[in-house]
């Protein structure tokens, strides 16, 4: 009797689990579709006769026969899969899900998938789980191998996700973790599973997954109705809860265009598409300054914004509604590309200011090739797209983007260039760090002053500590008061002179209450830099001038405040700081991050002065890029104007005895 009872319980449990994952015919799908859409005549007739199961079969037949709808993301005639994607697909069969590339090896989410499992309290890990990055590789694996196991598992996981992640009412601010951290149950889960950005991710990617798995026997009429009802719920959700601003809003709008274009059978499809187009046309004027800089002042998200705007155009070209984007929209994208090309280094990499990640040449060549198709007359873009084989470089070398606050000093466009990129712009948004005045410096094939980067975004405990460390003003190449973060980030350009033997940038930031920072940068004879920092105001405390050193052996001296890299011949530098009497130098361990959860150790340096009066604290730093450290020049520098002058500056610098007077008047 006991064994029989046990068997009945197990059988009931098996039936319950089977039913939980079973595909159900969702008849509400017919009320969501425009059954008068061309090709749906049979579906409409069967539905009106009350034969919804047959209508669902006819609907599946319609989608399998549909040829006029596709996306630019996948070519069904030439599906290929790489080694990494194959691994993602195979691991997903065992519920080991590739949620985030920063957390490898991937975590396993259990035989009975626990979509709420959060092994490391990093918000990105939990959010990005719900982007289902392994679904498209599973689809590719299915198409390449023909093995039904991928389709079977995909449909199971898709239904399982729907069942375990209900859309419940969540206050909008909760999606960005700015509200109540005590939320429980479905509400706590929904802030991750149904954040608009993740929803938009699924909206876009499921158009590819739909195409990849559509021929499978596992893609049943019942599953089709589940899929379409869920997809519709996604679009309606975003429509009512778009993010307020920034790159999230752009992603969501662009993906709503995808949804409306790929599933024109939905009654609201045209409204979805229009919603996305209207936002894109509006936000390109809101988020992009007239110099081409994106208002988050982060090279990574600037690049993302370019590609979002381009993706919207690509889908418009595919479906014939390019005329809904004005010429001004294209002109702005072109300016954004020119901006990005200018602030990038000769090897196609980018400064890692703010939350930027390091790109690579292969990735950027692909981008420039795509952009060159869109702007075939732009010779600069063509030059970069062809790695210099075609097109032409601009006639200028140094270039300033005054509204965005990015300034580039360069003496060449080649890899042998000396190039400094300075970031000193207006107040920006979440991804921007309080680092006004910072810079990166490239010389002859090497970045000698890489930014500290970001490492992680947000989360709990250690994750937030790591985030906050990389965001600090004091781990950038700029000046602080008592090593504290800047109170204000609203730099104003006082002078930009990008031509001649002495090129000059003068930028000023309010920084702290009663203490402003004026930074003057001189690029002398296309060979070395003189940076003058003046901290002006009644505020008292410790003034700290920070420099983040490159990785490797660096000889240094407290006596004369010098640092000379000891790298192999090709790219080295000497830095020497000249400050007030009593200035001290401090060396600390630092970090440099170029990708999410990847970083390496290096040395941070600060030159510290006690400010105990209203007199300005002033520094002169000379940075000489040199090929061989043995050739480090002898340096000296002094102020010619004895006190801070609101309207000008004059300093005298000697390099190996050669005197150079540097000055300006405002």
UniProtKB/Swiss-Prot annotation:
Keyword S-adenosyl-L-methionine in record: no
Keywords associated with the record: Lyase, Periplasm, Signal
Pfam families: Hepar_II_III_C (PF07940), Hepar_II_III_N (PF16889)
E.C. number(s) listed in UniProt: 4.2.2.8
Enzyme active site: 301
Location of this chain's protein in the cell: Periplasm
Reaction(s) catalysed by this chain's protein: Elimination of sulfate, appears to act on linkages between N-acetyl-D-glucosamine and uronate. Product is an unsaturated sugar
Superkingdom of the organism of origin: Bacteria
Protein's job: Specifically cleaves heparan sulfate-rich regions of acidic polysaccharides. Also able to degrade heparin and hyaluronic acid. Does not act on N,O-desulfated glucosamine or N-acetyl-O-sulfated glucosamine linkages. Functions in cleaving metazoan heparan sulfate and providing carbon, nitrogen and sulfate sources for microorganisms.
Protein's recorded name: Heparin-sulfate lyase
